[in-house]
Amino acid sequence: MLFFVIMGCVSANDLSTLGENTTVPNIIIVGDAPEVPDVPDIPDIPDFPVDPDNPDIDDQNDSDTVNLTIFNIDEYFVDGTLGVEHSNTKFVLTQNFDNLGLLKIEANNVTILGNNFTLQNVAFLINGKDVTLANFTLVNDFDFKDADGAAILTLANNTHIRDCVINYTVPRDSEGYGISAVGRRIAPISGLEVINCIINFEGHNYKANTYNYALKVSNCPNALIANNSIYTQLPLRDVNFGAVGADLNSNYVASVGIEYSNNLTFIGNIVASIVNKRPGSPFPTLDG
């Protein structure tokens, strides 16, 4: 099976004819793609992470199952934090949730199964390993500064984000990311998977030197980013070249930004970008 990545990239070497609020609709027209040799098939993905020494999924996920409601969620996310005492637990959403703010996951081996419910103005900061977020919708128009502005920020190994929808309108001139996975050069993140997700991301960092990315992956070797649809509306911004050239931090806007992530698989994804503003700068760019 052969997949193609569709990515939008808009740049301007001479954009004098563009107006202040120029919009570029449907910027991608795809014709017949050339043959690409040796493109691997997406590997079969289990519903939940599987311990290779114990592949029985049911045995791994039925030790503790909690149905979350508005009446009991504070018993587990105490002051917004799921502590390590709740490791090895599967949480099942039973309704929509609003305005919970930033939820921090410190516990390990946790699954949050959404059952297609919606979380409005809720963000996740993942510090525990082996965490799965699956099958819910996030609708945000608030910048979560304690999560670097991300709707989902993971700093831990083996984070699995599957079948989620993220609709994020970042407040004007604020930092924001749909999904952000950030390791360090001396401590990279392993086991990251983002699969079958839809990200609708709208950024408005017209003037401030803040970052707006739908997806950011840094220091995550061997990550799997597969079968996602990423749609962005972003302004054109100048690339901030440093003394030795440009890197990811040189771009204030991007649909997808990936760095220092060797052997990452990016396959079967659709990425489409629309320009929502052209500030007065000499060489504005929007990277796909």
Report residues per predicted region.
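Tyrosine-centered aromatic motifs in long, intrinsically disordered, low-complexity repeat arrays
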Residues: 39-42, 164, 201
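Low-complexity, acidic Ser/Thr/Pro-rich repeat tracts that form intrinsically disordered stalk/linker regions
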Residues: 13-75
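Extracellular beta-strand/beta-solenoid scaffold signature
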Residues: 99-102, 120-125, 142-153, 171-187, ...
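N-terminal extracellular ligand-recognition/capping segment immediately after the signal peptide
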Residues: 71-82, 86-110, 116-122, 137-138
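Extracellular beta-strand solenoid repeats
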Residues: 92, 98, 104, 111-113, ...
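Secretory targeting signatures
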Residues: 1-24, 93
